[in-house]
Amino acid sequence: MHKLPFVTKKQLDEIIKEFPTPFHLYDEKGIRENAKALKEAFAWNKGFKEYFAVKATPNPFLINILREYGCGCDCSSYTELMLSEAIGAVGKDIMFSSNATPAEEFVYADKLGAIINLDDFTHIDFLEKTIGHIPETISCRYNPGGFFQISNDIMDNPGDAKYGMTTEQLFEAFKVLKAKGAKNFGIHAFLASNTVTNDYYPILAKMLFELAVKLQAETGAHVAFINLSGGIGIPYRPEQTPNDIKVIGEGVRKAYEEVLIPAGMGDVAIYTELGRYMLGPYGCLVTKAVHEKHTHKEYIGCDACAVNLMRPAMYGAYHHITVMGKENEPCDHKYDITGSLCENNDKFAVDRMLPKINIGDTLVIHDTGAHGFAMGYNYNGKLKSAEVLLCEDGTAKLIRRAETPKDYFATFDCFEEFKEKL
């Protein structure tokens, strides 16, 4: 089954002349269309806001595109807060969701006026001691435990996740926070990852809406927003059907009208923290075939490796591969597509049926727009690749340069004996 890239071979050949492989390429047109569709799908909710999960793709150029559509930033670390501040996302444009949180991160989040989403009951006292007060607007992360199911399918196992408060802790947290001066409360939950179904958000929403009604009734705390977090996935495999964000939005609306409106809670804002859904399909890793090996298996070695895309090595994740210029040729060759790391799991594909690949062929590895570059690392002394934006007008723009050896050795610059040698 075909799954075609958002860029043509002709376009890519020109881009490669300016930016050598490997690099991550992003599709501005697709990003904009998707952000607009999300905004329209939840336009029925007056307070709706998407907080883009910065961890997925921490690039200010891409986040600024999303900000044109009203998106804020979901941050989970000090440097993500720094990045958000640098692009002008401060105050209620930041949702700070962290766990095992260092004191300095709470201090910085509070300084920026971010909405703080508490992961643990013990963080209430820790936060108050750290910043000297409890913010008037506060959120708590909820974990119901057990398994999360849609129909008879188990989607994930929240009971095994390190995140969030139990039901009892959540009720107690609202009471304690209210007594300490909090006035506007939020509920946050992330119960399944990369779901390719239109049912996940509506089911999660109904559960959280019912919880919100009970919380407000029993604690007297004003529930101002409900954060559905992330979890809406993308079709990595060509045979998968993409989620329909319009259907998802309508499903959440139906639950809202069934549960919150009758309870007199029609002012509750809906927040999301999508990362993969926002950018995943609109990025790809562009690499060249540089080596072939014929032993017990057929191998094609690329100039990219797991440093540039960790998901296949770490999770065994599937990423579709297109051999550019051979989109219509038969997939009659079985290959392992590898990088050059000294690790046998450095493989983008195992036993993948593809057209015959020749040295010098350009390979596009799909769906790397989220958790692609962001999960990069420097094992084996490998350097992270550049990021390039395919603009709406067809031009290509560098939005992050590739690392250099100087970057790699930069943390030794305080030692005189290495200043001139590295």
What residues fall within each predicted segment?
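Flexible loop/turn segments at secondary-structure boundaries
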Residues: P58-F61, P102, D125, F147-F148, ...
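Conserved, mostly hydrophobic/aromatic
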Residues: I31, K55, S77, A109, ...
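ATP-grasp fold ATP-binding core
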Residues: T137-N143
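Generic beta-strand/beta-sheet core signal
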Residues: A53, S97, D119, R141, ...
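A charged N-terminal "starter" segment
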Residues: M1-E136, K175-A179, K183, A217, ...
